[in-house]
Regions:
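Short, small-residue-biased leader/transition segments that mark boundaries at the very start
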Residues: 1-4
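Aromatic-capped interface at the extracytoplasmic side
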Residues: 7-26
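N-terminal/domain-start segments enriched in small and hydrophobic, helix-friendly residues
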Residues: 15, 39-41, 45-47, 156, ...
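Short extracytoplasmic/periplasmic juxtamembrane "stem" segments immediately C-terminal to an N-terminal membrane anchor
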Residues: 20-40
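Soluble periplasmic/extracytoplasmic beta-strand elements of cell-envelope proteins
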Residues: 24-25, 34, 109, 123-125, ...
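Core segments of small alpha/beta cavity-forming domains
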Residues: 39-106
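Surface-exposed, charged secondary-structure patches
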Residues: 102-136
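Amphipathic alpha-helical dimerization/oligomerization modules
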Residues: 128-130, 134-181
């Protein structure tokens, strides 16, 4: 019986370990088995998503001071003091007041993100569209930085922090006048 109780304990342990590897998600009332993954297995996807999310919050701007504060608050959870320094520099230069004064709307479009998993470094390539009353300006934007692992939170769902963030290129590529009737 000692042998059968050892076998029972071993079998139970295997079943519990197996059950812990299974995750179910409810679709309505139907449970669906999903594959559990580790951060290492999804790092490339999560890193790119994190970088794109930060750029969306930092560079999508509307002529609304509450909206700007909201998006900057969100962006600051995703970046270290290098992002805060850029924000403060722009604020001191009156950049955000100018947006409100001219009713400019800024949108960002990601072209690609190169991510080196080994070095945890990224380069972001995108275009920014700046729509003003009389014109639309398109700018080319290239930024770079590194990623550092941090605990996941509601404000930082990927558990990554952008560090040493800098702008490598931010230049005008096209200016169009609007036809105002």
């Amino acid at each position: 019986t000692r042998r059968s109780s050892d076998l029972s304990i071993w079998t139970a342990r295997v079943m519990v370990t197996d059950a812990q590897q299974k995750v179910y998600v409810l679709d309505g009332n139907v449970p669906i088995l999903v594959q559990r993954t580790t951060m290492e297995e999804t790092l490339d996807v999560e890193a790119r998503s994190h970088v794109e999310m930060f750029h969306h919050f930092f560079f999508t701007l509307a002529p609304d001071d509450k909206y700007i504060r909201y998006t900057m608050d969100k962006a600051m959870y995703l970046v270290d003091e290098t992002g805060l320094a850029q924000y403060n520099t722009l604020k001191e230069k009156g950049f955000y007041n100018n947006i409100m004064g001219t009713s400019a709307v800024f949108s960002i479009f990601c072209d690609s993100i190169n991510f080196n998993e080994e070095k945890m470094e990224f380069t972001y390539y995108g275009r920014q569209r700046i729509e003003r009353r009389t014109s639309i300006l398109t700018r080319e934007l290239v930024t770079a930085g590194k990623l550092k692992r941090v605990p996941r939170t509601d404000n930082n769902p990927h558990g990554l922090l952008i560090v040493d963030w800098r702008t490598l290129l931010n230049k005008d590529i096209e200016q169009k006048n609007k036809n105002n009737f």
